[in-house]
């Protein structure tokens, strides 16, 4: 897991940066760790139920280390979000597929768990509410749709937009993050590949 925050001036509104452009290229997919089979699970179909549970538990332990490696970045992100909340801003998650569903889940859980107003933590998912229960294929590959969907929330400089993309290169999220930057919002990327 990697957390990156940014409050950058956009010198070229409407233009995708070289770094963002390299993230969109399809040829990157075959080399990304998140897109490969995990070496421990290549024969999972031959494991007993107990072996599967033990394997999942062993691999889940990696999550603790991944979060531990990002403590400073996570704490810095929390401080920015707290400051933006104090300014009347919102936390807005953006994602596609499972990443989007996790953003929606967290946004839905904040009001009952932390007594936040429903509009304080929001989520945008590629494919809209239908994508919560059924895959909506192809939308994740459209950066302009991510920008449009996020734009429906009237993003401001007090908002924080978190793009969640396991691969770190989902075009829908990149388009939404670019739109957020154009609006002056603070942006955070939550990704699982070191190179993205």
Which residues make up each language-model segment?
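Short, surface-exposed alpha-helical recognition segments that flank or form part
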Residues: 65-72, 134-138
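Glycine-centered, small-residue-biased loops immediately flanking beta-strands
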Residues: 89
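Cofactor-/ligand-binding subdomain signature composed of acidic, glycine-rich
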Residues: 5, 14, 18-66, 70
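Short secondary-structure boundary/capping elements
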Residues: 44-48, 73, 138-145
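A short, well-structured juxtamembrane/interface segment
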Residues: 69-84
């Amino acid at each position: 897991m990697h957390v990156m925050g940014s409050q950058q001036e956009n010198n070229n509104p409407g233009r995708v940066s070289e770094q963002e452009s390299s993230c969109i290229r399809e040829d990157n997919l075959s080399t990304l760790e998140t897109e490969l089979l995990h070496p421990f699970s290549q024969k999972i179909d031959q494991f007993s139920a107990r072996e599967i549970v033990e394997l999942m538990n062993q691999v889940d332990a990696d999550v603790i280390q991944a979060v531990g490696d990002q403590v400073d970045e996570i704490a810095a992100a929390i401080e920015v979000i707290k400051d933006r909340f104090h300014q009347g801003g919102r936390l807005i998650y953006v994602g596609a597929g499972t990443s989007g569903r996790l953003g929606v889940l967290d946004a839905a859980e904040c009001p009952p768990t932390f007594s936040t107003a429903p509009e304080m933590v929001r989520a945008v998912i590629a494919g809209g509410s239908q994508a919560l229960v059924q895959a909506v294929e192809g939308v994740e590959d459209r950066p302009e749709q991510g920008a449009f969907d996020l734009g429906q929330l009237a993003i401001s400089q007090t908002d924080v937009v978190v793009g969640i993309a396991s691969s770190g290169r989902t075009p829908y999220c990149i388009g939404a993050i670019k739109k957020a930057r154009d609006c002056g919002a603070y942006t955070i990327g939550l990704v699982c590949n070191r190179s993205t």
